Amino acid sequence: MASHLIDFLLIGNNFGTPEMRAVWSEQNRLTRQVDVEIALALAEGDLGVIPQDAASTIASHANASALNIEEIAQDAVRMKHSLMPTIAAIQRQCGEAGEYIHYGVTTQDVVDTATVLQLRQAFDIVVRDTRLVAIELKRLAKKHQHTLMTGRTHGMQALPTTFGFKLAVWLDEFVRHLQRLNEIRERVLVGNINGAIGTYASFGELGPEIERHTLTRLGLNTPNIGWQSARDRFSEYASVTVLISGTLGKIGNELYNLMRTEINEIEEPFSEGKIGSTTMPHKRNPAALEGLASLTAPLFKSAALIHESMKVEHERDAMSWRAEWIALPEINIYLSAQLQNALGILRGMSVNEKQMRANLDLQNGLLLSEKVMFEIGKLLGKQTAHHLVYECSMAAFEQNREFKALLLEHPVLSQHLTADTLDTWLDPANYVGSAPQKVDEVIRYADGTGLLAE
């Protein structure tokens, strides 16, 4: 019976994906540990450290899918050790050749390297889905390059912008996330096969070569020196997941706000039969957006646990190590849910362009006060213009009147304005700056990196 929300049948997919849960499942953990033991045996057989026929037998007979996890778990309770029962089970599968299982390595060598194998699987999923989200953002940014909407600062209406510009900001972030993932891959996907305290003493002179051969077989990079007490690789990966999750959480929160009834500029995908409330039949709640935004906080907390694991006692200890066992699966599973959720939202959300345009007019023209100020400033000076336009702006607020009318009535400003001139200045379409051009620039840059290519 599942005891963590991640694995609940009813709501588990709110917190992770089946694909990512499979990567961090107990069975896959065991499988990757067996993979390490096989690769080690083959490397040692090739180098003459153990008999070649024993290595071949281990490779052909060690089978994680045939191991009984429940029996191994019972032995773990008795032995008070996390790996020895697995080694014993593999030994039984291999007969006499089993004497050469786990030859020279320590538990952490196998567990850490197996964890990196799992992380490689997770890494590929994260890269794939991060790229897919970036592709959707690129598509939407171009589609809405000229879609006018209100830009808001401090929660209040500020200036006109375009929805495509907002999306391009997010796209640019995602390109940087892909660049980060690309950069850290070589540093993070590194195995560790060097004995009890990392000195290769149990392997003899062939130690570094055994490590290199083993890790090459596994498709992992070889460290310059053992990293049992240097956990920065996992911490760096966690840091990048934090950045990706942070952007996803921000997107979820922003779209959540734009979906508010009073703003009504977008709506997350809606399907027949979707229920918003058990008591209010009319509700079309932003459930997917809430889910997207909500996972950032727990991911941040789990990532912090990985950062804390960088503090290691002497050459190694299990206190920090075990925290990674908890947190690495969590950050990847949470992130997988966020990425898949974001994909569904971006692919299916509705954009209410009509309401976006209507919201530009909510303040009776005040959204263009900056435009008026700078135009008047060319004649009277910026500071004087700010003072005079401020007077009209506050009067528009307090009297609930049209900004244009107050400008035309102002004893000083009216001398420099005409109704036709104000109509041009107060048209939001004429004051989006370089927003459309920046959308194209971001898309060109994204395409130029090659990171969005299939």
From Swiss-Prot:
Pathway: Amino-acid biosynthesis; L-cysteine biosynthesis
One term of GO molecular function: (S)-2-(5-amino-1-(5-phospho-D-ribosyl)imidazole-4-carboxamido) succinate lyase (fumarate-forming) activity
Reactions it catalyzes: N-acetyl-S-(2-succino)-L-cysteine = N-acetyl-L-cysteine + fumarate
Keyword Amino-acid biosynthesis tagged: yes
Uppermost EC category: lyase
GO biological process: 'de novo' AMP biosynthetic process; cysteine biosynthetic process
Documented EC number(s): 4.3.2.-
UniProt superkingdom: Bacteria
Database matches in Gene3D superfamilies: Fumarase/aspartase (C-terminal domain), Fumarase/aspartase (Central domain)
Residue numbers annotated as active site: H154, S277
Record's keyword terms, sorted: Amino-acid biosynthesis, Cysteine biosynthesis, Lyase
Any single Gene Ontology cellular-component annotation: cytosol
Entry function: Catalyzes the cleavage of N-acetyl-S-(2-succino)cysteine into fumarate and N-acetylcysteine. Is involved in a S-(2-succino)cysteine (2SC) degradation pathway that allows the bacterium to recover cysteine from 2SC and to detoxify 2SC that may be a toxic metabolite. Can also perform the reverse reaction in vitro, and has minor activity against 2SC and other small molecule thiols.
Family named by the database record: Belongs to the lyase 1 family.
Note: Is able to complement a B.subtilis yxeK mutant in the ability to use 2SC as a sulfur source for growth.
Listed NCBIfam families: purB
PANTHER family: ADENYLOSUCCINATE LYASE
Protein name: N-acetyl-S-(2-succino)cysteine lyase
